[in-house]
A protein has these predicted regions:
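Active-site neighborhood of phospho(di)ester-bond hydrolases with catalytic His/Asp-centered motifs
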Residues: 8-10, 48-55, 81-92, 216-225, ...
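Extended active-site neighborhood of metal-dependent phosphoesterases/phosphodiesterases
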Residues: 69-192
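Conserved beta-sheet core of the metallophosphoesterase superfamily
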Residues: 172, 224-298
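A short C-terminal boundary segment appended to hydrolase-like catalytic domains
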Residues: 287-431
């Protein structure tokens, strides 16, 4: 059985003072590392990545992400996986509210989407604003998040409003991890005294698509109770996203339905109130065949800090006293129930067409590790990046003085198309050696 395991963290809320001598949260982060070394390695066979469902930073500042990167590297080191094996989505704390508060244009764009009464009108307005090449108002507040996330290929833009990554299971199945953004509209009016929290916008373009032989794991910061137009979105999400991971609420629960496994994660760094209890999770996913139907098996291991705050242990209140929660989803039966009225030969045509517009798909047949190549490239200096791209004729000397992050990403895509990624990586490693 080809099992895939993941470590799931949420709401870490790194601040600039994290790891300072007076940082009282450092001990609990170290306790997570110890729990992974002693208990996770004993229970999990094949850790494929680290999943982070938002609020990586506290204020969306670059210094906070540098600290986050160092910690996530430590988590990866426990399982001897690459530092690029991190998958993340932004939360409301990953939005730099100073950027929003200082720009009437951003605030106006957010409110223009927020005030729409139907999801179709909201989607139309959203599309209008993200198509503005002069000033992309709805992405500007997460510039620092994108600088951090680009090394994992989890950055988002008008050209890629969600990301996805494929893993291989048995029974001719792939596990597709999809990361969507629920924080486009986040601003100072999210939480106002005496008012209900503002609802967040998730457009129809972020709903995962159907595809043959694919099981979907969805990552999103805000859970469905925080969504605008939930009644329009959630039924389709439930049909298409078999496993769903959420953060934001800082309270942990697992919802098991016949056709879904949904994890509402607690926070690694919750606010220190009377019910303060840090939590995180392990997840194992595998597949099998029964009666010629393919079954997706999901195991969730909820973890929480012990009462004496000394270490992490089984979250028995969430797992009903067991080591983990186990659930099986009959994928073939679920897909048939959702789609049986459609002709087999055209079953996924429309959705696959939508997917190709903004995919980040791992091509398992390729002999190179694209994620590591891109991660390493973003670890070298801006000057070295420009030098390499110029040497490989991926940019011109004339454009090198005008480069921004988007143009760098486009140059990397050209390296893919021109089959120059291996050469780019070789030059990247040479730069790293020169700078040691």
């Amino acid at each position: 059985m080809n099992e895939l395991s993941f470590i799931h963290l949420s709401d870490i809320h790194f601040v600039k003072s994290s790891n300072d001598p007076s940082d009282i949260d450092k001990d609990l982060r170290d306790a997570i590392i110890t729990d992974l070394e002693i208990n996770a390695r004993e229970n999990l066979k094949n850790v494929a990545g680290i999943l982070v469902t938002g609020d990586i930073a506290f204020s969306g500042n670059i210094e906070e992400y540098e600290i986050a990167k160092e910690y996530l590297n430590r988590v990866c080191d426990v399982f001897h996986i690459k530092p690029s094996d991190v998958y993340c989505v932004p939360g409301n704390h990953d939005v730099n509210q100073n950027v929003v508060n200082s720009s009437d244009l951003i605030f106006t764009a957010q409110n223009a989407v927020d005030e729409k009464g139907t999801i179709d009108d909201a989607d139309k307005t959203f599309s209008k604003y993200i198509s503005d090449n002069n000033f992309n108002a709805l992405f500007k507040p997460i510039d620092e998040y994108n600088e951090f996330a680009k090394r994992f290929e989890c950055n988002i833009s008008a050209d890629k409003i969600f990301w996805q990554k494929d893993f291989v299971l048995e029974e001719n199945l792939k596990l597709r991890v999809v990361g969507i953004n629920s924080s486009f509209l986040s601003n100072k009016t999210d939480h106002q005294k005496g008012k209900l929290d503002r609802l967040m916008y998730i457009g129809q373009a972020q709903i995962p698509c159907y595809e043959t032989d694919v099981a979907t794991l969805l990552m999103c910061h805000h859970p469905p109770q925080c969504w605008k137009f939930k009644d329009n979105i959630l039924p389709r999400i439930n049909k298409r996203a078999d496993i769903q991971l959420y953060g934001h609420m800082h309270s942990q629960s697992v919802e098991i339905m016949d056709e879904n496994a949904i994890l509402y994660s607690g926070a690694v760094h919750p606010t220190r109130t009377v019910d303060w209890l840090p939590r995180y999770n392990w997840i194992t996913i595998s597949s099998k065949t029964e009666n010629e139907e393919r079954i997706l098996k999901v195991e969730i291991y909820p973890r929480c800090l012990t009462d004496d705050r000394d270490s992490f242990t089984i979250d028995s209140t969430c797992s009903l006293g067991e080591n983990h929660i186990s659930h099986e989803i009959n994928l073939d039966r679920k897909r048939k129930a959702a789609l049986q009225d459609r002709k087999k030969e055209t079953l996924f045509k429309d959705e696959i067409e939508l997917c190709t517009q903004s995919t980040l798909v791992d091509q398992t047949s390729e002999p190179i590790d694209e994620r590591k190549i891109i991660y390493d490239f973003y670890e070298i200096s801006w000057i070295d990046q420009i030098d390499i791209l110029t040497q490989l004729s991926l940019i011109t000397k004339e454009t090198s003085t005008k480069l921004d992050s988007k143009m760098i990403s486009e140059a990397i895509n050209r390296a893919r198309e021109q089959e120059k990624l291996l050469e780019l990586h070789k030059k990247t490693l040479n730069k790293m050696e020169e700078n040691v």
